[in-house]
Amino acid sequence: MSYTVTLRETDKKKVYVDPGIREGIYLYPGEIKKLKLLEGSMLEEDEFERIRLQYALPRAKHRAIAILAKRDKTEKELRDKLQQSLIDTKTLEETISYVRTCGYVDDLQYARDYIYFKKGRKSFLQIKMELQKKGISSQVLETVFEEEGGQEMEDILMQIK
């Protein structure tokens, strides 16, 4: 299948390559020049996918790792941050899958760490609400709070003895 390329400038740095039928990708002007993409030119689906895999996907992975290098994030927080970077849906999903597979994003571990650092200063209800806002699923919360509830009971028993 062939697409007619539409180039739309989004800001000073990126140009949106819109194939018309499916979601487009963002490329830098230098990349568009290198690829010799012109307004109205025809682009085959496999060529569009090759460009996405060669340019958009590595850039998205690099961006995700840069975001996570500064501070741990939940999957939802990372997804929201990447969407602000004008990353197309398919590339976004592949990037999230990549960082999850590599262990860079782990909502269960994030919730455990968050509870560990906050439990002395905040109630479990406050912590639970904050984690829900951060996009932690109810299933993960249930698992973590079951673990933590058992630990809390052990701590209380140790203090009594």
Regions from the PLM with identified roles:
Residues 1-161:
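An alpha-helical, amphipathic repeat domain used for nucleic-acid recognition
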